[in-house]
Amino acid sequence: LKVTEKNCEELAEKVEADWEVNRHLVDGDIVIFNRQPSLHRMSIMAHEVVVMPYKTFRLNTVVCPPYNADFDGDEMNMHALQNEEARAEARVLMRVQEQILSPRFGGNIIGAIQDHISGTYLLTHSNPEFSETQALDLLRATRVDELPEADGVDDDGREFWTGRTLFSELLPDDLDLSFTSSAGDSVVIEDGQLIEGTIDEDAVGAFGGEVVDTLTKEYGETRARVFINEIASLAMRAIMNFGFSIGIDDESIPPEAE
């Protein structure tokens, strides 16, 4: 029998012991997701449901590396857990945030990828300046609802905030870290503030991003999950702000390389 708004009260009066009642998934339900072939532990992870329109599975792109998912026709499988014991086990052992670190090499397998990396690079490499409206727009998908003190005033007398300052808003206040970026410059973070350097793959990327790896090991999986979500959102806002495109010439091998 299908339960509808018209017959739900009548069926509620008729329901008896041993009836099996099924329902649709709702926001917050825990399910298991996987992509074949499931070759390692992180090939099968637990996710919380967000019900959306249409008939395709959608997932946060930062979890693509452990699934080896690349959107070229991959088939994903979802399994709805049927009892409380299974749901509890999934929440404790199989949630995505519990799989950030790879058991194979000990570093983070989950982190920023592709356009996220381009976005953080554009945001921090030349340390561009943003107006109050622009800064709030970049941070609107994060927990930050109030800007820090401005970095300066432009020629028109308007306050501005730099890209490194906006990135720093996502870091713990007591984080101290230094390393060399993929771009070859020194990255220095003191008391949760990015002092110098470019944030790229070696900083926040999957498979060994220094910031993600440090947050996971020293601040815990929950704090790392929040950072990964927020840096992905900030990076996408940044790349949309600057614009980013490639052409066929970008695929050509330069003469010196030949």
Residue ranges and their predicted role:
Residues 1-43, 49, 187, 191-196:
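Extended, highly charged clamp/arch subdomains and adjacent linkers
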Residues 1, 41, 46-258:
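Feature marking long nucleic-acid-engaging regions of large polymerase/nuclease enzymes
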